[in-house]
């Protein structure tokens, strides 16, 4: 198991068990306003995960905050819960955006975080945040979220290209709902149930193939040897094999793909 996989599994356990690790020095806070989940992450000055909280959410759609009050309340609740558990107060945070988002939407995302008394000291794009966790200097990071799929291409540790496409887990759910003749909410529940994966995956596979075809187009000319896929929508067991077949490029999915970007946001909670 790669080091980052051990880190991600440990971080997941902290969230599930509502625990925190002993720490020394300064803490860094990251707030990820996702389409399906809001995740708040805490790391120490060595980027070791210390604590975290996750909350299912529908306050963001395609990288745009559609329920400001709901988002603010959720972040305030999670921040308060972590502060009470750890006996600390947080004053600064980093947050993240899909690549290519317009500046007005960036401001709204920052405003949500600042509405709970946090000073936003860094806004990073989501795939680049994920690259921080994975320790990538060369390759492509594809962040498959609920509403959008973002890609960053890195060369020698520098981001040389970013893009965002409006397709993601929500589109899988819509296809599934149409196929099963059920509501969006029911399809979302079925999609997230690991026991239903044999039923679900053949239905959503064309959506994954479309995502991979888009990524293949973006990486042409960049000599990409490996693609890392992260985000909750890539949790299917065969996701990376479909991606690899479609792109012709080795594709790796870390453990706990939903938590990669949120953890990377906390790691980048430092003044730029």
Where do the protein language model's features map onto the residues?
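Nucleotide/phosphate-binding catalytic cleft detector across ATP-hydrolyzing
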Residues: 1-35, 39-144, 158-272
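A cytosolic small-molecule/anion-sensing beta-strand core signal
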Residues: 155
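Short glycine-rich anion-binding loops that position phosphate/pyrophosphate groups of nucleotides
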Residues: 147
